[in-house]
């Protein structure tokens, strides 16, 4: 079993972009972007696809599957 975690924070750093910049691009609150970047919450699949498009990346580069050890 695993849980999906996003790599939005790393992707923004790679592109030299900020949470505020992404919030403006998406029309979202910067607090929402912050929650996504810390994986406190996750964007919808539709939003994740839009983020990938905005950052000119593949959506696969924004998602990782991390195993949970019991």
Q: How would you describe each model-predicted region?
A:
Residues 1-18:
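A short, Lys/Arg-rich alpha-helix, primarily the initiator
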Residues 12, 23, 52:
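The alpha-helix within a helix-turn-helix
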Residues 13, 27, 38-40, 67:
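Residue-level detection of the helix-turn-helix DNA-binding "recognition helix"
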Residues 16-35:
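Short alpha-helical DNA-recognition segment
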Residues 17, 43-46:
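Residue-level signal for the short linker/turn that defines the boundary of a DNA-recognition helix
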Residues 37, 55, 63-66:
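DNA major-groove recognition helix of helix-turn-helix
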Residues 46-61:
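DNA major-groove recognition helix of helix-turn-helix/homeodomain DNA-binding modules
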């Amino acid at each position: 079993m695993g849980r999906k975690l996003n790599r939005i924070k790393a992707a923004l750093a790679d592109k030299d972009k900020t949470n505020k910049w992404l919030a403006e691009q998406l029309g979202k609150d910067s607090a929402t972007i912050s929650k996504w970047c810390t994986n406190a919450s996750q964007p919808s699949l539709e939003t994740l696809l839009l983020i990938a498009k905005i950052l000119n990346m593949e959506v696969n580069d924004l998602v990782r599957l991390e195993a949970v050890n019991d």
